[in-house]
From Swiss-Prot:
Residues 595-606 have a biased composition (Gly residues). It comes from Drosophila melanogaster. The lineage of its organism: Eukaryota, Metazoa, Ecdysozoa, Arthropoda, Hexapoda. PROSITE patterns: WW_DOMAIN_2 (PS50020), ZF_ZZ_1 (PS01357), ZF_ZZ_2 (PS50135). This is Dystrophin, isoform D. Residues 143-157, 331-345, 518-536, 716-727, 815-830, 1682-1694, 1765-1796 have a biased composition (Polar residues). Residues 1815-1826 have a biased composition (Acidic residues). The gene is Dys.
Length: 1854
């Protein structure tokens, strides 16, 4: 550390010497230039920070600000300060060089071709708070030129200048730090001046006034040559003037040099004081150089323009915001310095020529004044007005240095306290605003005051001081001078008080009383009385509230909705709140023009030009705030401009705003140097290092290229705004009760920032910040060059000055106050920041949005105050040692001082330091208390969370007591518990908003905090018990506690709600079950009572007939008791449920249940005994009749089940599987069959019916044969329904029924039939049902299928069957949806499917039928396709069935066939000559008196004159004479109809279904879970169905319309289906699609298996070849090859181990393979659906080959009549006609009696073999692909195998 300090000292000394040499050379050059430069060429002042707008390009060293300067340099154009400029000034401006090219588009021109227009300043100008030269005192005559406004002379005493009115007034209304009057430290951070301070102000003001008067008087007569001498004399006189016994104060300096005497920077034309003046100033006492507190007084404009009409600039009062109102030592407070060694007081002892790089300057000239010969002055520039002092000066320097540090800390404390207070209030008000939903209006009302000061308009603007008020105040100030001693302090105080008093009076005249009422009690503590010209006493001036108090008052007024509203401002609706207003898009006011008192001429207002008395004064336009007013013309009319976004032409106004606000912030709390590497993401480091300075925040943003987060930018801007709100609140707002100025300034500042960011940021924040860094880096280089130049000048100074300067620097380093040159970067230099921002503004930028989330950001800043307070406390502690050492050193020096004045001065300094230190500690304590009170809200939240958690736990315990105990099952107790739950839930609902609100607040709080470990209270408090917890630790502990409590409360609350819901559900369930239980008990009791009555009526049978009758009665009683037994079992189950769930069933219910169980057992025993008696009587009667027992004669007795093994005779044997599925063994042939021998014979007989041409009649004939053989035609539907209900099958349609239960039900049905073989009928019926619905013989079918299969074949009316079938699938509302309807149709279509006839009826896909039914019911196609929840009623279903749909047309045909069996028609068949016709009678409706019998029509026989195209009418009953006459009439009409008519109007006898290429099939119930494994291969019927269905679809795909005939015209359609076949059937050809499929199945199986084997062998060969190729490729890499071999061997070993010992792995592998095969088969099915249509078309063409010629001839020779078989769709009669004409025979294949297989003939089937081979090969290829992908690990092998397989398939197909 010592080495580093020594090196830095040596480096600094070397730089110091170089700087001194450069400075001396530079001073000589400047003096020579000043002697020869004319004053007429001066270009005025300029604003430092603009890129050399008025600087001559020829200057070699354009320095805008000194290095290490920590305040913003403010250089004001003299044209702005002196509105009465003459023509010579304008000519001087014209003669000056113009701005550089980059500023041409930025600065608006005022008509001068070569000069840039100076920029108007905003209200934060510190120089505009004092009178200007034009504002002369009343007694001093002023020499004004004719160009000055007439109002200056006419106003008399004191006139507000035109240029300064907006800026001055805005400064007064926006800066509370300008000059604060009144207030105590307890209420505000701004203190009153004590007597000593007022005395100093009085002296300063008096000297200033004298100097101004002298300059004004001499300006009119003095010429440019002697003005320099005049000013030097005036300055010297000013310094040496008597001040009531006190030393004359020096000319105040605006800047405070850090380590050298202050040398105000002058331009080359500025005259230097003569050498005598320099010596006198150097010899002046130290007391003359400093104020009472050791600070140098601020210096104003000490330069002036050389024009003849110009006047000396004013010397404004310095602003002292941090003075102490309680000290009586007469000191003036001063601003803090950002650096520990940057104070002007630290370097007063330096020699006159000494200078360091931290020197700061205030004013500079830009125009170079040269003489005619161009020579430069030789006068040397004085370095200071002070002379060297004795050793006491060093002590005072040390004291002032420490005081400077204490003052810095005090400023930080005040800043933090105000900021925390403001932001905490904002946070609290935001929460209140969200809950209140009050109409808020934050718009600032505007006012339009006329020139006469009339108050007729109520739209008063409280934040704007009108010129009238200032004039009145100045008048009262001049009047009051005669009544009291006029000192500068008193004058200034009276001036400000008059302004505030006038504003308050004018404000109170326009504002409502309720707005003034909340702040009317605030009074100032001072007792100063102000006397005006009109009144003897002034009203008391109210106390100065702090910004936080103002904001609190404002938000209180907002909450009370008492903000004054103007007439022309927009109103806010009831839905608008504070958040909605804050979050709205920001808009900036448009750029307006004009000056106070001046008129806007023409279009100059839009372009920025301002006309004053017809002339342009050169003042540029400036951006008006939203609340500002624009006086226009002399009559006082005001003009309000529209608001709009800031345009590129007004960016310099925005930059001006930023610069002025930066000056105010810098003046209040100069920023500390923050390293450029500071993290921009840390709000803590930002606030701790940079305070609230806008300069620091801009430095932090621009110094880090990674701070690209919009959130961070928003945070920085909002934080700056909060600092502005807490520090820069205007003084007028602090002394008036108005709250509008605060919110107006707040919004204006924020709008300025965001408008600039939104408008001028380019591609992104990264590019923007990068450009900022580059601009600052370039400026840093300029500053370094300036430092080197200064160091060079310092080297040229005398050696004793260098030595003294080095000693002073060494003392600073030893005391810890030396500043590192590297610590001051360009990023902290205000001028460089200003210049960087302005350079960036020159470039076009795209919009870069910054989130407008102000209030939320303020809450985030409030949350960081704990961390800031900790940093502040640590900073105070670090200065405690310095303070103690300084205090001790000062006390020791008091005894060694010889001069009494020095001792008094040192004593006063020590007292002041002690007092400030105590104030600092008290403020720190106050801040800590305030921050602790800020955490009270979160502590209250934590307490509330804990209380709610305890409440939830209590309620949970209460719920456990209520809901977990035993539940009484009676209705009264259950209802009482339901009421208790309702009351309990009401308590929860009442508490729900509070719980959710606390949970939401807690989650929001912990969301903004870093995640910490949720330890317990014991762990968290373990370390904190033994030591003091800092604020950060307390905050961390608070966060941890809130996080833990939020989680606990959330969990407990959710559990409580869930348990409450479960309790409610349980109570509802118990109530429902208990009511059902009691209802069933009552029903069961009545049933048992009725059965007992029947039991008492039993009598012994007296005869056999009576015994049979009693047996039937007993059976009916058993059926009833079966239902009662089911009810009793249900009751017992419910009682067990209640017992398991701790539900106390009422005692009467339990007693009744036990009694019913006993009575039911007794009844069962009695019925068994009764059955034995009746059976004995029945057996005796059977034995007497001599019957063998195989047939019964109307016995009606149920009895035990017969032995079904007797249903077959030897050599057949009946056996059953484990699932009770019967199968039959033929011992003679040693074969087994699923079908009964009688069933085989039956199916063989059905094959003979395949000769019938028409599918509907063929199917009906087959079903009629089955129906008769199974004796189902003798069982009525009502008997079947009763049997279903008797055996508990009601409402059990979705359940499964096994074979024993089916046998029981069938037995109950067959016992009602007389003279049948009961065992044979039962076995055949079971066989038929299993064939239809359980072809896989799983032993179980659905109850719905069992019922449908029996009802379809039993005896009953057709409509009754339809109604019953619909009732089976209907819901409780008697409606059926798509799914239920599909299940019903699926079970119905299985009957023709078993017979091989399903293809003619639309196939097994029932989706088209369901669609047809829904469309017939009036449901739209969109609803059907959208799978909406649609359903139909019974009448819709019946209406659809009356049209005889294609899928169910065989059922009505079956009923007509059964009705026509016994019908005899008195007519003769014209073909076979049968008479009478038995069965169906068919009459031709075109041929007169032409009848056909049933046999001739079915087999398609034809006559000479009759053709199949003729319409026919079918009769199933005997005709009447009326029908004969009607048929004759129809035949006569058809005689006159042509063939075209019948072709145009084809008619079918059923409702066709569009089944070709329909959508996916609806849900079809699988018979069992085992059906899907090998269903397509094992189930022959399924395969026949698939191929035949597609065949029929392709065959009849292009037929005609869907018209439906009337029932009366049915006979007319019969003739359409009559067409004789041209030849006999060829026995060698396939007779039907069934036979075709069977032939293909048998013949191609072996061939396909051979192909599969070949493909597998080829696959193995390809794999071997692939392995060889891989080994060859890897031969060059032995290591890899060995690794692969090793891996392969390892895997082989593992697989071997798995095959040997791991059975589970093998089983899993098999399951995966099985799953893959299933998925492959599903893919095969999908491929079949896509390809079968084309394949079956080829099949049809091949099938047409045997009789292709005959069919063609027949088709061409027949007319196309209605319903023609050649052009119509498949229908009831004609479908098989077309098929028969093409296939010759269309009957199912015959079955071999021996093995049950279908017989087939392989001749003439080569074409079929080829077609099916292609189809099967595709399936095999898919299987092989799946097998290869699952078993082969190499992808290339699989691909090669697949390609080879496809190639082989192609070859086979060829």
């Amino acid at each position: 550390m010592t080495t580093t300090i020594t090196a830095k000292i040596a480096q600094r000394q070397q730089q110091h010497q170089q700087h001194q040499q450069q400075q001396l050379q530079h001073q000589q050059q400047q003096q020579q230039q000043q002697q020869h430069q004319p004053t007429s060429s001066m270009n005025g002042f300029r604003i430092t920070g603009y890129p050399a707008a008025a600087t001559p390009p020829a200057r070699s060293n354009p320095i805008y600000a000194k290095p290490n300067a920590h305040e913003l340099d403010l250089h004001i154009s003299e044209s702005l300060l002196y509105p009465g400029s003459t023509t010579q000034q304008q000519q001087a401006l014209q003669s000056s060089p113009g701005p550089p090219p980059q500023l041409t588009s930025m600065l608006p021109s005022s008509g001068l071709p070569g000069a840039a227009q100076p920029i108007a300043l905003k209200g934060n100008n510190p120089f505009l708070n004092s009178p200007s030269p034009t504002e002369a005192a009343p007694g001093v005559p002023t020499g004004l030129s004719s160009a000055q406004p007439a109002t200056s002379a006419s106003s008399g005493n004191y006139e507000m200048p035109e240029y300064a009115e907006p800026s001055r007034l805005r400064g007064l209304k926006q800066r509370p730090h300008s000059i604060a009057v009144g207030g105590s430290p307890a209420q505000s951070s701004f203190v009153d001046y004590n007597a000593q301070q007022q005395q100093r102000l009085l002296q300063l003001s008096r000297q200033q006034q004298q100097l101004r008067n002298a300059v004004t008087a001499a300006a009119s007569t003095a010429n440019g040559g002697d003005k320099e001498t005049l000013y030097a004399a005036l300055f010297q006189q000013y310094r040496q003037s008597p001040t009531n016994g006190q030393p004359a104060p020096p000319v105040p300096l605006h800047r405070k040099p850090a380590a050298a005497p202050v040398v105000p920077r002058r331009s080359q034309s500025t005259p230097r004081p003569p050498l005598q003046q320099q010596q006198q100033q150097q010899q002046a006492g130290i007391n003359g150089q400093i104020n009472g507190n050791g600070n140098q007084r601020p210096r104003s404009l000490d330069r002036f323009n050389g024009g003849l009409q110009s006047e000396a600039p004013p010397i404004p009062l310095r602003r002292f915001p941090n003075g102490n109102g309680n000290n009586n030592n007469g000191t003036l407070s001063r601003q803090k310095s950002p650096k520990k060694s940057s104070s002007a007081d630290n370097m007063l002892m330096s020699p006159a020529g000494s200078q360091v790089n931290t020197m700061r300057h205030s004013i500079s000239f830009h125009g170079g004044q040269e003489t005619e010969n161009g020579s430069k002055a030789e006068q040397t520039r004085p370095m200071s007005y002070a002379a060297p002092a004795p050793d006491q000066a060093y002590l005072e320097h040390q004291l002032r240095a420490y005081s400077e540090q204490l003052r810095t800390i005090t400023e930080s404390v005040r800043k933090y306290s105000e900021q925390a207070k403001l932001l905490s209030e904002l946070k609290r008000q935001q929460q209140l605003a969200k809950q209140s939903q009050t109409n808020l209006n934050l718009l600032t009302p505007t006012t339009c005051n006329n020139s006469t000061g009339s108050n007729g308009n109520n739209n008063f603007q409280p934040n704007m001081i009108s010129p009238e008020i200032v004039s009145k105040s100045l008048a009262s100030l001049s009047t009051s001078q005669a009544n009291e001693a006029q000192t500068p302090s008193n004058q200034l105080r009276l001036f400000l008080d008059n302004i505030r008093s006038s504003m308050r009076q004018e404000y109170q005249q326009h504002m409502p009383d309720d707005v003034l009422k909340p702040t009317s009690t605030l009074k100032r503590n001072g007792t100063d009385s102000l006397v005006t010209s009109n009144t003897a006493a002034k009203p008391e001036v109210e106390a100065t509230p702090t910004p936080s108090d103002q904001l609190r008052q404002f938000l209180d007024a907002i909450r009370a909705n008492k903000i004054p509203e103007s007439v022309d401002k927009p109103k806010m609706t009831s839905s608008q709140t504070l958040d909605s207003f804050i979050s709205k898009p920001l808009q900036m006011p448009d750029v307006t023009s004009g000056t106070p008192g001046g008129g806007v001429v023409g279009g100059q207002a839009a372009s920025g030009g301002v006309a004053v008395n017809g002339q342009t004064n050169g003042i540029p336009t400036r951006r008006r705030p939203k609340s500002s007013i624009i006086p226009s013309s002399s009559n006082g009319k005001l003009e309000q401009r529209e608001h709009s976004l800031v345009t590129s032409e007004s960016f310099h106004q925005i930059s001006d705003n930023l610069r002025l606000m930066s000056e105010d912030l810098q003046a209040l709390s100069p920023s500390k140097a923050i390293p450029s590497s500071a993290s921009s993401n840390s709000l803590k480091s930002l606030a701790a290092n940079g305070g609230s300075s806008l300069t620091t925040e801009l430095r932090v943003i621009t110094s880090s290229p990674y701070s690209t987060s919009p959130k961070l930018q928003q945070m920085v801007m909002s934080k700056s705004n909060s600092s502005l709100g807490s520090v820069t609140t205007p003084s007028s707002a602090t002394t008036t009760p108005s709250t509008a100025p605060m919110i107006t300034d707040f919004n204006e500042i924020l709008d300025s920032f965001q408008a600039m960011a939104d408008k001028y940021k380019s591609k992104g924040s990264y590019d923007y910040l990068r450009k900022c860094s580059e601009a600052l880096r370039q400026h840093s280089l300029q500053l370094k060059l300036q430092q080197q130049h200064q160091a060079h000048q310092q080297q040229q100074l005398p050696a004793h000055q260098q030595q003294q300067h080095q000693q002073q620097q060494q003392q600073q380093i030893q005391n810890g106050f030396a500043s590192d040159d590297n610590s001051s970067s360009c990023s902290t230099t205000p001028g460089s920041i200003r210049e960087a921002v302005q350079n960036l503004l020159l470039q076009p930028r795209n919009g870069f949005q910054i989130l407008d989330d102000r209030m939320r950001l303020f809450i985030d800043i409030i949350d960081s105050q704990d961390r800031l307070s900790q940093d502040l406390q640590s900073e105070i502690e670090t200065h405690r040692v310095v303070y103690d050492r300084l205090d001790g050193t000062g006390r020791k020096l008091l005894g060694s001082l010889t001069s009494q004045e020095d001792a008094v001065m040192l004593q006063r300094r020590l007292d002041e330091m002690n007092q400030r230190w105590n104030n600092l500690k008290s403020k720190s304590i106050a801040i800590r208390n305030r921050l602790e009170s800020n955490s009270e809200h979160w502590n209250a939240l934590l307490l509330s969370l804990r209380e709610l958690t305890e409440w939830v736990i209590r309620k949970d315990t209460e719920l456990s007591t209520l809901g977990l105990g035993p539940v009484r099952g009676d209705a009264v107790s259950l209802q009482k518990q339901l009421d208790d739950h309702k009351a309990f839930r009401r308590q929860l609902e009442d508490k729900r908003p509070i719980v959710e609100s606390n949970l939401t607040s807690g989650r929001q709080y912990i969301a903004n905090e870093a995640a910490v470990s949720d330890t317990s209270d014991t762990e968290a408090n373990h370390d904190s018990d033994s030591r003091y917890m800092s604020a950060e630790e307390q905050s961390r502990e608070l966060t941890r506690s809130i996080r833990r409590e939020v989680g606990k409360l959330s969990e407990q609350w959710n559990n409580l709600i869930d348990r409450s819901d479960n309790w409610k559900h349980r109570l509802d369930e118990y109530m429902t079950k208990m009511r059902q239980f009691q209802k069933i008990l009552e029903d069961l009791s009545s049933r048992v009572a009725l059965a007992e009555q029947t039991k008492t009526s039993w009598l012994p049978p007296s005869s056999v007939g009576e015994a049979n009758e009693q047996m039937q009665q007993l059976q009916r009683l058993r059926d009833k008791m079966t239902t009662a037994s089911a009810l009793l079992d249900d009751c017992n189950e419910q009682q067990s449920f209640f017992t398991a769930n701790q539900v106390l069933v009422p005692t009467p219910c339990l007693s009744k249940l036990e009694d019913l169980n006993t009575r039911m057992k007794l009844l069962q025993i009695a019925m068994d005994e009764r059955q034995k008696v009746l059976c004995q009587a029945g057996a005796q009667q059977t034995h007497e009749n001599g019957d063998d027992g195989r047939t019964t004669s109307n016995s009606g007795t149920i009895g035990p089940l017969p032995n079904l093994g007797q249903s077959v005779k030897p050599p057949w044997e009946r056996a059953t599987t484990a699932a009770n599925v019967p199968y039959y063994i033929d011992h003679e042939r040693e074969t087994t069959h699923w079908d009964h021998p009688e069933m085989i014979e039956l199916m063989k007989g059905l094959a003979d019916l395949n000769e019938i041409r028409f599918s509907a009649y063929r199917t009906a004939m087959k079903l009629r044969s089955v129906q008769k053989r199974l004796a189902l035609d003798r069982i009525s539907m009502s008997t079947a329904c009763e049997s279903f209900d008797r055996h508990g099958l009601r409402a059990q349609n979705d359940k499964l029924i096994d074979i024993p239960d089916m046998t029981t039900v069938l037995h109950s049905l067959y016992v009602t039939i007389d003279k049948i073989d009961l065992t044979l009928m039962l076995d055949l019926a079971i066989n038929w049902i299993l064939n239809v619905y359980d072809s896989q013989r799983t032993g179980q079918i659905r109850v719905l299928s069992f019922k449908v299969g029996l009802v379809l074949l039993c005896k009953g009316h057709l409509e009754e069957k339809y109604r019953y079938l619909f009732r089976l699938v209907a819901d409780t509302d008697r409606r059926a949806d798509q799914r239920r309807l599909g299940l019903l149709l699926h079970d119905c279509i299985q009957v023709p499917r078993q017979l091989g006839e399903v293809a003619a009826f639309g196939g097994s896909n029932i989706e088209p039928s369901v669609r047809s039914c829904l469309e017939q019911a009036g449901i739209s196609q969109e609803a059907i396709d959208g799978n909406q929840d649609i359903s139909i009623e019974l009448q819709h279903f019946l209406g659809w069935l009356q049209h005889e749909p294609q899928s169910l047309v065989w059922l009505p045909v079956l009923h007509r066939l059964a009705a026509a069996e016994a019908a005899k028609h008195q007519a003769k068949c014209n073909i076979c000559k049968e008479y009478p016709i038995v069965g169906f009678r068919y009459r031709c409706l075109k041929c007169f008196n032409f009848d056909m019998c049933q046999k001739c029509f079915f087999f398609g026989r034809n006559a000479k004159n009759h053709k199949l195209t003729h319409p026919m009418h079918e009769y199933c009953t005997t005709t009447t004479s009326t029908e004969d006459v009607r048929d004759f009439t129809r035949a006569l009409k058809n005689k006159f109809k042509s063939r075209k008519y019948f072709k145009k109007h084809p008619r079918v006898g059923y409702l066709p279904v569009q089944s070709v290429l329909e959508g996916d099939a609806l849900e079809s119930p699988a018979p069992s879970p085992q059906h899907t494994t090998h269903q397509l291969q094992n189930d022959m019927h399924s395969r026949l169905e698939m191929y035949a269905s597609r065949l029929a679809q392709v065959e009849y795909g292009g037929t005609g319309s869907n018209s439906t005939p009337d029932s009366d015209d049915e006979h007319q359609l019969i003739a359409q289906y009559c067409q004789a076949l041209p030849g006999t059937s060829n026995g060698s050809a396939p007779k039907s699609p069934v036979q075709v499929m069977a032939a293909m199945d048998a013949e191609q199986r072996e061939e396909l298996e051979a192909i599969i084997r070949d493909l597998e062998e080829e696959n193995a060969n390809l794999q071997a070849e692939y392995q060889q190729l891989c080994s060859k490729e890897q031969s060059g890499m032995p290591e890899d090859s060995n690794g692969m071999q090793h891996s392969s061997s390892s895997m082989t070993g593992l697989s071997g181990q798995g095959e040997q010992g791991q059975d589970m792995m093998a089983e899993a592998k098999l399951l995966r393979q099985h799953k893959g095969r299933l998925e492959a088969r599903m893919q095969i099915l999908e491929d079949h659906n896509r390809q079968l249509e084309a394949q079956l078309q080829r099949l049809r063409q091949l099938l047409d080959e045997p009789n292709g010629g005959g069919s063609s001839a027949t088709s061409s020779g027949l007319p196309s009549a209605p319903g023609s078989a050649l052009n119509s769709k498949p229908n009831t009669l004609q479908t098989r006609s077309v098929t028969a004409s093409q296939l010759n025979t269309d009957s199912p294949a015959k079955m071999n009696q021996q093995n049950g297989h279908y017989e087939h003939n392989s001749k003439n089937s080569s074409g079929l073999v080829t077609v099916i081979t292609e189809q099967e090969l595709e399936s095999i290829n898919d299987d092989l692909e799946d097998s290869s992908s699952s078993n082969t690990t190499n992808t290339t092998t699989t691909t090669t195998t697949t390609a080879t397989t496809e190639k082989t398939c192609v070859e086979l197909q060829k």
